[in-house]
Structure formats: C-alpha cells, structure tokens
Amino acid sequence: MRTYKAKYFLSMFFCLFISATLSSAQEKIKINFDNKASIKDWEFIDEAPKNLGDAGPSTWEIKKGPLDGNSLFQGSNIWGSKADTCLMGTFAIYKAEKFKEFTIEMDVFAADNDGMGITWAYESTKKHYRVIMINDGWPEVPVDKIKGPFMKIQKRVSDDKPWYELITAEKGITYKEQAPLHWKFEVKGGEFKLTREDNKIIKGADKEYEEGYIGIQLYAQQGHFDNIVIENTWAVDPRKKVSTTWAQIKKDHN
C-alpha cells in the first residue's frame, strides 16, 4: 500500500511539474491585419474634443500598403492639444487582453514627420504610459519645454494640462520617413525599453501603473502598422504553482 501511494504521489508530482512549466511559457500573439476581421479585438479612441486642435475624427482601417500586403492604417491629420503644446491625437488599443510584463514588436511605415509611438498600461486617455517620437521641430511652445525632434517616455496623469509627466527624453533623434521601420518594446519590473531598427534606444522606469492594455498612439501622423507580435512575459513561478497544488493533493489523500 505504501509503495502504491509513493508511486502515485511521484507520478502526480512529475505531471504537475511538467504542466506548470509548460503553462508558464506564453504563446506569442501574432496580428497581421490580413482582413477586416483582424481588427475585431481593437478599439480606436480619439482624445476628448477639448484636447484637440484638429478634431479628426481618426480614420483607422485595414488597407493595402507598403509593408506586407494589408496593414492597419490611420489616414487623418488628427492632433492636439488645442494650443498644440503637447503631442496628442488618437489611439489604437488592443483590447483582447491586459498585460503587465511583455514584449511587443511591429513593423511601421510613417508617411510624414509627425508624432507616433506605443502606449501601454492603458486604462483610459488619462491613465497610461507612452513612448513617442517626432521628427518635426514641434511643439513650437511645448508644455514640458522639450521641442522635437525627440523620443520621450511619459506617464499620462490627467485629461487636463499638463496631461503627461516626463519620465525620460532623448533629444535630436529622428526616424526615417517613407521607409519601413521596426520597433521592439519591452516592459519588465517597471522598466521600459524601446529598440528601433536603426539601433536607437530609449529606456525609462516607473512602477505606478502596472497592468493595462497595449496600443499605438499618433499625433498628426498618417501611418501603417503590421506584423505585430506580443509575448506576455509575466508568469507565475512554476515552482510555487507546483508547491501549492502538491500541498492540496497531499491534503486530499490523507
């Protein structure tokens, strides 16, 4: 009887360990925008009218473009703030899942020199982080005193001026217009890192906002986005999962 019980527990422990290890590895989410159905998990959100100079609205759609067949395209010139002192406009938010720690990669094609970037920990227009870049020497009178060109990491704190808190900025950095670009963005332990195809990097850190949605933000920019790959890197330690479940099994068989 003891031999049987020992074999049973050993077998169960092995199965639990394999199951927990496999479940801790996350499958990558791949979004290629092949057809209109591929945007069913996306929500398109414009800033409140009080924060817009060009009210748009935004025109997000699936359209054939310069990247890889069809892509997600935004063709309007929607921008804010109303006095044009802060880069604002429109969001494309992936609403199928929230993320805490993750890696996202995407191909990008910018039609002009205006603002574009990634948003994360998104809960609303007034609560999220963003990394944003612009080639133009704009805003002319920036609310945070930093004119373009730049890359910035910022935290949205309200729907009123100054809108964002600055986390970090890299001045004088531009991107290629009318050319394929690639972004890789990572969030881990409250630290953020964007790496571009030209090896330009910006890093920052903040832990106030944790979990939320991921998306794209544009300011007066017409652009294509495609071949998005998201990997959820937040996982329960499999050793803790096995330990908890193992304790419950022993309790049930005593």
Segments from the language model and where they lie:
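Extracellular glycan-recognition surfaces and repeat-rich motifs
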Residues: 40-80
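Carbohydrate-binding surfaces in secreted/extracellular proteins
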Residues: 33, 106, 176-205, 228
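Flexible glycan-contacting loops in extracellular carbohydrate-active proteins
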Residues: 204-229
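Bacterial N-terminal signal peptides that target proteins for export
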Residues: 2-10
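Bacterial N-terminal signal peptides
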Residues: 11-20
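Extracellular carbohydrate-recognition regions
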Residues: 25-51, 238-250
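Short, aromatic/His-centered strand-loop micro-motif at the edge of beta-sheets
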Residues: 159-182
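Secretory/extracellular carbohydrate-interaction modules
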Residues: 80-158
